[in-house]
Amino acid sequence: MRSIVIHAPRDLRIEERAVEALGSGQVAVRIQAGGICGSDLHYFNHGGFGTVRLREPMILGHEIAGTVAEVAPDVTVVKAGDRVAVNPSRPCRHCRFCLKGLPNQCLNMRFYGSAMPMPHIQGGFRDVLVCDATQCEVATRAPATELALAEPFAVVLHALGRAGSLLGERVLVTGCGPIGALVVAAARFHGAAEIIVTDIVDEPLAVARRLGADRAVNTAAEPGAPAEYGADKGQIGVMVECSGNERALRGGMEVVRPRGTIVQLGLGGDVSLPQNMVVAKELAIVGSFRFHEEFALAVRLIDTGRIDLTPLLTGTFPMEDAMAAFAAANDRRSAMKVQLLF
């Protein structure tokens, strides 16, 4: 089968790999669509992120969907021909965090397309993926291109779960990449009264508008605009920080009301924070990492049409044009979510 393999920064190759044999409880999924994630771009551009580095060739990809081609004899939950989204989260289910109901914090997580462990966990950008049947969420309406959005949407659903109720809240979203745009869509679905989104590029802000943002602010052109929400100790109930930028976080703290919540979703470096403000305003600052059980909900919402994420899709490329696809995904002015078709 064909696979998209990263060897080093900018060294992306289409290689033949053997299809694994089916084991008990497993299925073979013929992959049809795969979304390029920010982590895929980090491997492509830099060979990793933070302290995580490529140490061997690795198949990229974890935002994947396709059709079941074959099932093991003991599999009953899916059948050949089913269209499915594949959950890339594979916790061990027996470590102390799994046993406490925190599978996203699993000590032995085998998340697709990850160079954290050695050997690396190979990803899903391949013609055929053999996986556990329990990883497959069956869909009846949505095409594979929409179902491949379930993984990043699950990330966002988990983050908003960390935020608490959004009903009637004014929500600020800082950073409008694919995750920030999905936060906008999910916040609207969760009953936010007003959604303000900020970025330094106009094009992704236009997509956020289509997904439900009430106000989209280019802070490069209007650097002082968010500050107007700082009156009377702050007018924002919930802030979701998606940029990983210290200035965005600090600026957001100025406008979040007392006892408001800040969810840190974007990955960045170490930052210094005004602790006196955290104390005086009794701010709740929480992190959000990956997802697990939210994946099934994400698939259900997409498949039933209760939420429309198609404005996020800005480009598709056949897998043989993987280099062009990654180049397009790198251009924030022309692309939000780029997908590969297999």
Functional labels for PLM-detected ranges:
Residues 173-176, 186-251:
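Adenosine-nucleotide cofactor-binding segment
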Residues 256-257:
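Helix-to-beta-strand junctions that scaffold the AdoMet/dcAdoMet cofactor pocket
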Residues 83, 170, 260-261, 284:
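Short glycine-centered segments of the SAM/dcSAM-binding site in methyltransferase folds
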Residues 261-263, 273-312:
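Rossmann-fold dehydrogenase core element
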Residues 94-174:
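NAD(P)H dinucleotide-binding glycine-rich loop of Rossmann-like/cofactor-binding domains
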Residues 180-181:
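N-terminal Rossmann-fold NAD(P) dinucleotide-binding loop
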Residues 20-34, 48-99, 140-142:
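Glycine-rich beta-strand-centered segment in the early N-terminal region that forms part
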Residues 3, 250, 292, 296-342:
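C-terminal hydrophobic helical "lid"/dimerization subdomain
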